[in-house]
Amino acid sequence: MGNIFGHLFRVTTFGESHGGGVGVIIDGCPPKLEINVKEIQYELDRRRPGQSKITTPRKESDTCEILSGVFEGQTLGTPIMIWVRNKDARPQDYQDMAIKYRPSHADATYDAKYGIRNWQGGGRSSARETIGRVASGAIAKKILQQYSGVEIVGYVKRIKNLEAIVDPTTVTMEQVESNIVRCPDSECAEKMIELVEKIRDLGDSVGGVVECIVRNVPKGLGSPVFDKLEADLAKGVMSLPATKGFEIGSGFAGTTMTGSEHNDELYTDKLGEIRTVTNRSGGIQGGISNGENIVLRVAFKPTATIRKEQRTVSRQGEETFLAAKGRHDPCVLPRAVPMVEAMVAIVLCDHLLRHYGQCNTLKSENVYGN
């Protein structure tokens, strides 16, 4: 239960951190989409461990294999299976966690629910599960880009109390990828790297915020009431490990404004398109995309597994202490950027297919544009 995401573009992830490998089955991808391993591998390389001095030292190439659904470089319209083998697992590092629960991790809750758990690296609660999401996101990005030139750019906005100054309307992927922390504000990025290294040396961890902007979004994605676009985006990104908050557009800051201050006034541009003067709605109104940029932010807590000794209990309820071993990120933010982008792409791709299935079967004129 809970391993499948989406309606028409359906993603099913499988595998565990220290098992044979992890992967994904993607159902509902349109046929004849040109896709190759290199495009998927590019996104996985942005997510993989061991990529810099501020990420987990676990050495995994995360080399992907496409096992089905693609023939001669094109999708078949049938389920696509992508597989990544685990090659640097060290289950012995987690022996203490077989009997001791990590504070603020999924150990105790998994035991409470299932009565059994894979304590080697956390099993399904490990961030290695997100490999399948990022691989799926690469395909979703390709569909969105081909349809209307959709561009999704995520970046680290804040780590602990260090906040970058970034204009989301102009930020580029090149700026994001110019440093190991994936923060387009180069001056702030240097401070962030220093902070993460300092915290890591103390055996501790830090959290922060990833901001994501989506450009060239088609109008009309999303549905009223239960399937609002922002609700599905929230579900998608909040299903990622370590997430603790979500906001879109003005978010919580909008609560300090009056209606006249917050409303996005309308105008007609030179092409006759209805546009908004401001974008406090974050590109979505009434649960439906309005064609403006979608801007969202996701809060990530500090990594739960740390070397610093903390009080906990055993499976038998006995009070004890745990200084976690193993290899873990002192800050998940740099590797979380492609994860957020992937979930945003999956949600938008799913809604694009749903929109066309409902609204373009019988063509009709729409006064609000295409």
Curated annotation (Swiss-Prot):
Reduced FMN (FMNH(2)). Coiled coil: none annotated. Pathway: Metabolic intermediate biosynthesis; chorismate biosynthesis; chorismate from D-erythrose 4-phosphate and phosphoenolpyruvate: step 7/7. FMN binds at residues 124-126, 286, 301-305, 327. GO terms for molecular function: chorismate synthase activity; FMN binding. It holds the Pfam family Chorismate_synt. Keywords: Amino-acid biosynthesis, Aromatic amino acid biosynthesis, FAD, Flavoprotein, FMN, Lyase, NADP. Its cofactor is FMNH2. NADP(+) binds at residue 47. GO terms for cellular component: cytosol. GO terms for biological process: amino acid biosynthetic process; aromatic amino acid family biosynthetic process; chorismate biosynthetic process. It catalyses: 5-O-(1-carboxyvinyl)-3-phosphoshikimate = chorismate + phosphate. Its EC number is 4.2.3.5. It comes from the Bacteria. HAMAP family: Chorismate_synth. This reaction introduces a second double bond into the aromatic ring system. Homotetramer. PANTHER family: CHORISMATE SYNTHASE. Belongs to the chorismate synthase family. This is Chorismate synthase. It comes from Trichodesmium erythraeum (strain IMS101).
